[in-house]
Amino acid sequence: YQICKAFRDDPVTSLHNPEFTIVEWYRPSFSMENLMNEVEEYVQTVVSCGKILRYSYQEVFEEKIGLNPHECSLDEIQKAAYTHLDIGSKDLRFTEYLDLVMSEVVEPNLPEFCFLYDYPECQAAMATIEIDDHGNQIAKRFELYCKGKEIANGYFELTDPIEQLRRLTSDNIERSKKGLPEIPIDERFFAALSAGIPKGSGVALGLDRLLMVMGDFEEIDSVLSFSIKRV
């Protein structure tokens, strides 16, 4: 595990500062569900929230949007975005429409404290993909939301070096299309995967955002010693 600074060059908002603090840990032989239990116990030690509710990504998406995110087409998710949001005529990929609808329509209506789990395959990132009881390919990934804030992001980790390389290559192709620099291959990471590492789960939790929840703050600036606004 480690507690460290992380950096992400996204727009500055009430929830995001380019430099922020995370606690990240990995559990060999832990399932995704095991790690969700541990994250819940961790949060309950500092926040009075009771039992944290759990919903599949499909469950909340179907309830609010009326579409199965694992089966709907690009046209269907595009239509849903245009129906619920004033976004003009954007030409986005399927996963980008999913992100947009989830963040702008679904997330604001989530309970105060809840987990979302089993994400669409296209949003697997570095999570393992499995087949659910309905034959859908789902990413074994979860996120924790507290009072409207995404607090944690966890995976049942992908340990297959061939699949990891395929995903990185695919991501770099998309980055090149957008004029973004490619992400270099981490040779030591792939060497470790090739040597064989145990299956398990890992999570990154935003400590600044957790402090916001603990203190009922609306601005991340309120819990930082030196935010980008005051540099």
Predicted ranges, named:
Residues 51-70:
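Short, conserved secondary-structure transition motifs
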Residues 1-37, 41, 68-231:
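A translation/RNA-centric and nucleic-acid-associated enzymatic feature enriched
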Residues 32-57:
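Acidic, low-complexity central loop/insert segments
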